[in-house]
Amino acid sequence: MAESIQSLDQLSQLKGAVTAPDAPKYEKKVDKFGRAYATGKRKDAVARVWIKPGSGKVTVNTRDIEVYFARPVLRMMIQQPLVAAARNGQYDVICTVAGGGLSGQAGAVRHGLSKALTNFEPELRGVLKKGGFLTRDSRVVERKKYGKAKARRSFQFSKR
């Protein structure tokens, strides 16, 4: 094999042809209603997300996204995976989210939406992975320590 390669051009052509036989092959996962499902997590929030082809309507806990997430920044955050994949307005999103605050819930919906998109269209996995949408944000609140006012803040010090 190594003897047959004479130049770098041949090597670059060979690179695309050779893939590992055990490389994971992602396939479309939809239920009997034609919906893709995924769960997303962020801080203390957990979101269950279903997507189906539609007009782009987003429903959170049976309420419209404009009602549930009043801040435009949170709505934009949820739409990011669809915009990155150039699928904005092509899917209806239904999700239930519980726990945490609004920012954590928006992050959980975004994470779940990204995973559901890859279940519906596995070819989008590379784009979403590159954008960092499929990675679980593991940052959580640091616990309070005894002998301290908060996690790191010490009590006020007095010399005398």
UniProtKB/Swiss-Prot annotation:
InterPro entries: Ribosomal_Su5_D2-typ_SF, Ribosomal_uS9, Ribosomal_uS9_bac/plastid, Ribosomal_uS9_CS, Ribsml_uS5_D2-typ_fold_subgr. GO terms for cellular component: cytosolic small ribosomal subunit. It comes from the Bacteria. PROSITE patterns: RIBOSOMAL_S9. Pfam families: Ribosomal_S9. One of its GO terms (biological process) is translation. Keywords: Ribonucleoprotein, Ribosomal protein. One of its GO terms (molecular function) is structural constituent of ribosome. Belongs to the universal ribosomal protein uS9 family. This is Small ribosomal subunit protein uS9. It comes from Bradyrhizobium sp. (strain BTAi1 / ATCC BAA-1182). The gene is rpsI.
